């Protein structure tokens, strides 16, 4: 059985992620039309209609009833459709009408979650939307172990605008696809990890950051600019935290955190685990000071389906402080 361990050193998280210890666990959803409502990608109007129909109050109520401490949502992924306006993105890619939604769903979610004491985090790939050829070309993105200097400068501009738009409404960012950190982000000359983190924190200096470089079954940190570990895993039974590499509640300065999914795969399918299994895994990691995020499929209207809501509620009940 594999164990989670430190692979790459990182610096101190400066206390930004301390709130995760109190939050303990949260929920992620992939609100991507190509996954939950493919027809919505036939036109910009169909996409806007889907985003407009997202029931933020209903979802906030579900998360509160489950006892989740935070919520992580995809801004977008590979299609080029996003859940918030971004003038920098529109200018850089030149696509009209814009594939960025008219509604700022991120801001609306934050406003619905804040009164319930639930923090909001956002997911974004570190590369261009891979299935939007026009955007890939305009952003000058080349997938692979390449410097991608022009792309990085443009992507930081996009990220900075979102960060400034949301300010303290967003408490953290989980960046996917950081598969080539040596080639892209570790060189001393900008743009690099430091400037990327600066763009992410432009609107909120307290935003926590995780950089994900794939499913590798290890709690790792890629940069001193990270505050918590991405730790994407397909099999949560393999998650182990301990040993001499875990010290003072940190993995070399970063707060330990694991992300896995409850469905048959990310964002899809029926529940694959029993309540007892997910409770055991969550309780085990939380008891050691880690935070755990569970991805659950979301419906077109923005609500979590009943089987998953029931399972999330079981986690919350089992971890409730008495």
Give the role of each language-model region.
Residues 1-6:
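Bacterial N-terminal signal peptides
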Residues 8-10:
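N-terminal signal peptide c-region/cleavage motif recognized by signal peptidases
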Residues 13-322:
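Mature catalytic domains of secreted/periplasmic carbohydrate-active enzymes
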């Amino acid at each position: 059985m594999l164990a989670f361990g430190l692979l790459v050193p990182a610096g101190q998280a400066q206390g930004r992620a301390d709130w995760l210890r109190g939050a303990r666990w949260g929920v992620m959803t992939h609100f991507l039309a190509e996954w939950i409502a493919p027809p919505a990608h036939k036109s910009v109007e169909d996409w806007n209609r889907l985003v407009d129909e997202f029931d933020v109050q209903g979802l906030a109520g579900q998360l509160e009833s489950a006892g989740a401490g935070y919520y992580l949502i995809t801004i977008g992924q590979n299609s080029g459709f996003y859940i918030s306006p971004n003038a920098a993105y529109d200018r850089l890619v030149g696509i009209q009408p814009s594939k960025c939604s008219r509604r700022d769903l991120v801001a609306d979610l934050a406003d619905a979650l804040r009164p319930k004491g639930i923090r909001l985090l956002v997911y974004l790939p570190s590369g261009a939307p891979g299935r939007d050829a026009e955007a890939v070309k305009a952003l000058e993105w080349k997938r692979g172990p390449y410097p991608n200097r022009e792309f990085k400068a443009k992507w930081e501009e996009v990220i900075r605008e979102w960060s400034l738009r949301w300010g303290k409404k967003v408490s953290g960012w989980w960046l996917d696809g950081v598969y080539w950190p040596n080639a892209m982000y570790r060189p001393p000359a900008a743009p690099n990890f430091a400037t990327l983190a600066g763009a992410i924190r432009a609107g909120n200096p307290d935003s926590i950051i995780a950089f994900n470089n794939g499913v590798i079954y290890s709690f790792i940190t890629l940069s001193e600019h990270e505050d918590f570990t991405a730790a994407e895993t397909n099999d949560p039974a393999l998650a182990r935290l301990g040993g001499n590499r875990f010290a003072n509640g940190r993995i070399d300065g970063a707060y330990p955190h694991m992300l896995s999914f409850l469905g048959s795969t990310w964002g899809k399918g029926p529940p694959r685990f029993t309540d007892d299994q997910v409770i055991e895994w969550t309780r085990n990691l939380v008891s050691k000071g880690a935070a755990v995020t569970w991805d659950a499929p979301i419906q077109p209207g923005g609500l979590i389906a009943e089987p998953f809501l029931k399972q999330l509620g079981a986690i919350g009940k089992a971890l409730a402080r008495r």
